[in-house]
Amino acid sequence: MFEIKESSMEWEGKSLHIKTGEVARQAAGAACVSYGGTVVLAVVTLQKDTAASKKTSDLSGLALVTNFLAKSYALGRIPNGFFKREGKLSEREVLASRVVDRAVRPLIEENLVNEVNIVCKLLAHGNRKVLPEIPALIAASAALQLSGIPFSGPVIGVDVDMRGSEVTCNEIRETEGGLELFVACTEESVVMVEAEASEASEEEVVNALSEALKSAKPVFSFINEFVKSVTTVKPIGVLYDNKELCEKVRAACSGQLESVYNERISSKEKRHNKLGQIYTDTFAQLSDDGYAESEVLFFIKKLEKEIVRKNVLEEGIRPDGRSLTEIRPISIALDYLPGTHGSALFTRGGTQSLVVATLGSYQDEQVMDDIDGERRESVLLHYNFLPYAVGEVGALRAPGRREIGHGRLALKAVKAVLPGKEVFPYTLRLVSEITESDGSSSMATVCGSSLALMDTGVPITKHVAGIAMGLITDGVRSAVLSDISGDEDMLGDMDFKVAGTRNGIVALQMDMKVRGISIATIRDALNQALAGRLHILEKMEHVIAKPRESLKDSAPKILCYKIDKDVVHKVIGSGGKTIRGISSDTSAKIDIDQNNYVYIMADTEEALMEAKTRVDMASGASDSNVPQLKIGELYDGKIVSVVDFGLFVVLPNKQEGLVHISEISKNRVNDIRADYTEGQAVTVRIKDIGSDGKIKLTMRIDEDRVGSGGSSSSPKKRFGAHPRKNGKDNRSNNSERGFNERSGSAEGSSISRKRFF
C-alpha cells in the first residue's frame, strides 16, 4: 500500500495544500499542489540507471525535459477546434514550461547522466487571479525532492506586483502598469527572474526581489518538513565522474587552452578554429584508451571554465580581450529592405538581427485562447533563429521553445513604448531574423525592433534597448560582464537580460547556471547594465532619434473611431450585407470590435474617407463637418463615372450616389456615354438612402417621384429646361459654372438647394 501524505498552510492570504502518494504512484516522484483554487500535479520520472550508466554518447548537458500542460477541463471548457482535444503545447504552455525548467535546472547536479522528465499538469484553475506557475513550481520542486534525484531544493516561485509603495504578492492585477515580477528563489538566493515594467528604476527591481524572498520564507520550512515526513525517499540517479580521465585531459591540453585564451582573440571564428584543433588532437590522443569523444569534451569544457574564470577574476580580461564593462562595436542600417513598411539591421559584435515591421488591420490580430482567457493580440513579435546564424547545418523546423521565449521577452520590452490603439490603430507584426549570433540575440532583437518601429513611422515615445549581462564567480569572488558573447554565456554562471529606456527598465530575464545569486550581486549587475544600456541608446539615437513623421507609401491607411452601441447593427446590416457592401464598393477592410470601435483600412486616403462616410451614413452619425443629406431635396453634383446602367454623381459632401439610367429622363436614353461625360455638372434629387448608406438619385426633378424612403413636401415645379430635351444638352450655362455655383431657385419654386462649401 502507498502511504498518502498531505499538509496545508496559509500563504499570502490563500490556502496552500500539498499531497503525495495518491496519484502517479509509479513515477519517481509526484506531488499535487493546490493554491488558492488552482491545482497542479507535478510528476518526475527518471531514466533507468542500467541504461544511463552505459550512456556516454552525449554529456553536453543535463538531459532535462519539462512540460507544463493546461487542460481545458481545468477552466471548465471544451477545447476549440474540430477534434475537441488538446494538441501540441500552446505558446502559453511553452512559456510556463520554460519558467519551471529554468528554475529547477541549476539545482540539479549537472553531471547527472539519467534523462529526467518533469510534467506539470494544470488540473483546476478556479482562481484566475493566481498565476499557475506558482503551484507548478512548488509541485515540481517537491516532486524532485521526493524522487531522490540529486536536487538542491526546494525552490519557490513568487509573483510580485509593485505599484509605487504598494506591493502585492501572488495576486494577478486586472490592469497593467507598475512592475510585475516572477521570482524563483531558494532560502538564500535568487535562481530565476522574469519581469516587465513601466520604466522601473534599478532600486525598485531590487526592492521587489527582496519582497519576493521575504514572501517565500515560510514556505521553505513547510516543504522541507513535508518531504521529511515521507520515509520512502531514496537517492537515485547516476552521476558521471572519471578522475583519471580528468587528469589525462588536463595533462593533454591544459597548456594549449591557456595559450589560446591568453591570446585574447576577438574573432569568434579564429578562436573556435584554434580550439577545435585542440579538441581534435586531444580526442586522437585519448581515443586509444577507449574514451568516447563526449567524455573527453566534458572535461575539456570544465577545464575551459577554470581558465576563463581565472583570467576574468584575477586579471579582469575576457576571452575576446574586452574589459568587464566594454560593449562590442555597434552598426545600424535603416530602411534596409525596400518595399517593406519598416526595417532595420542591428549588428553588435558577432550578433546581428534583421527586424522587419509590417502594419495590418484589426482583421490581422491574433486571437488567443489559453489559460489567460480569450483575447486579441494586436502586437506580434516573432523571433527566428536558423542554423546558419552560427555557421551550422541542420533541419529547418517550426519555432522551438527558445525562439518562442526570446520573442516573448523582446515583445515585453517593445510593448512598453508603443502607443495605444486610439493613437495608432494598426495591428503590428515585428519579425526578427537572427542572421548572425554570438550571444545576446534576444537583446539585439529589442534594439532592432525599436529602430524598425521608428523607421516605419510608428509614434513610439522613445527608443528601447537591451543588453545581456553575465557573471563569473568562484564562490568568493565575482565579476559582472557587460554584453556577453556566446562563449561567455556557455562558460559563465549567469545570463541576465535587461531591456529599458533612458528612464527605466521595461523587461528583464535572469537565468543561473549556479545555485542562485545574492540581491547585492543583482544590484551591481543592474547598475552596470544601466551604463551599457545608455551607451547603446546613444548609438541608436545618433542614427534616428524620433519616428518618421509619416508612414511609408507602402503602408496601409487605417482609421479607428468609436460608434454608439445602438447603431452597430445598422452598420453591419442584415447578415452583414451593409458592411460587406461598403467594403466591396470602396475596396476597404472594415471591422467592428466588441468595444464598438470601427476599424477601416484602405490603400489610399480617398478610399479610406469614402468608406468612413458610408459607415457614418449607415449609422446615422451626425458630424458638423460632414453635412447630412435629406431625402427629397435638390443638390448640385458632378458626374464621376458613366456606366451602362447609369451615372455615379459625387455630392457636395463628397458622398457618391447613383442615378439609374431610368432616372435620367422620362424619355429613353439610347447612348448614355455620348450624352454624359465625367466632370459634367448636374442637378439631382435624393430619391432614397438605403440602410447600407447607398444613395439613390434622380434627375427627373420636374416630377413628384420621391422614393419610399421619404416624401417631399415641395410642390411639383419646373426648374428650367430638362437636361435631355430633343436629344440636346440645354444646360450649357450650368456646366460652365463652378461645382459650387448655382443660381437661385426657379421662379415659384419652394424647393431649397443645399450648399455645403
Swiss-Prot record:
Give the main localization category. Answer: cytoplasm
Q: Which cysteines link up through disulfide bonds?
A: none
Which parts of the sequence are annotated with region: Disordered? 702-757
Q: Name one Pfam family in it.
A: S1
Q: Where, in this chain's numbering, is Mg(2+) bound? A: D489, D495
Q: Which ranges are annotated Basic residues under compositional bias? A: 715-725
As recorded in UniProt, its EC number(s) are 2.7.7.8
In terms of domain of life, where is this protein from? Bacteria
Show where the KH domain sits. Answer: 556-615
- Family per record: Belongs to the polyribonucleotide nucleotidyltransferase family.
NCBIfam families the UniProt entry points to: polynuc_phos, PRK11824.1
Instruction: Output this protein's name.
Output: Polyribonucleotide nucleotidyltransferase
